[in-house]
Amino acid sequence: MIPALQAATVDQRIEALMRTSELHKPEGEGPFPIVLQFHGCGGKKNLQERWAAVAKSAGWAALVVDSYGHRRISKFQAYATVCTGLQLWGRERAGDLFAMMEWARRQPWIDPNRIVIAGWSHGGWTALDAMSMTPGRQIENATRLYGLPEEPLAGLAGAFVIYPYQGIGALAPVNGLRIDVPVQAIVGTADSVVGGKSLVRVLNRMRTPSASIDVAIFEGATHAFDEIEAQDWRVRYDPALTERAHRMYAEFLTTAAKPSSAS
């Protein structure tokens, strides 16, 4: 069960998140497209920097968002409470995503029409929940975040989700996605944490405004196959599949989330 949420304004959430989030910015003045990266339930890890480097090499800025710093959730607490669903469900954490979208739109060096969200596991849950909720009362009730614009996801050009959790408590499988942008998902067939074939079925059935979610199936991939430092017995690092995923990330950013006619 989700504990009582602490209300905050968008400006308060932005300030809190930016204290411990990490920005990776290409050389030059821009304006640059940006990808907002949301970590898994274990917290911000080294793998996020490696993915951010891929984005930067493709000419994109990357903000590695830390959802735990301002909430004072330690690594132990994260595994004991967030990973088990006792606190910080995807719909609540979506407030961080909406706040960072607003932050990005305010930066003069960022292209406000080319913002991509990327999420790993719990971060994927967060991204898809954010894309499934209706602006106004539903979002405010879920996030307790106030002062959002009429369209909190204005400027969103795409979503890239890696082994996203879509089980009990996830809104997207029920609501479907509201925002019409390309969505790329990566699912491993040996993922015993969020599911392999079962997750593929959920994503393939998910209602979308137009094109279905593009689900890439990675044969033999476990959960967190891209984490070199993983110590979970359910996880096995696979360098070849990680390289494949990184290539897909760069291609998605440069192709699927291409410049709009308005930018």
Q: Residue ranges of each PLM-predicted region?
A:
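Acidic beta-to-alpha connecting loop that harbors the catalytic carboxylate
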Residues: 189-192, 220-222
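Short beta-strand/loop motif that positions the catalytic acidic residue
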Residues: 179, 185-187
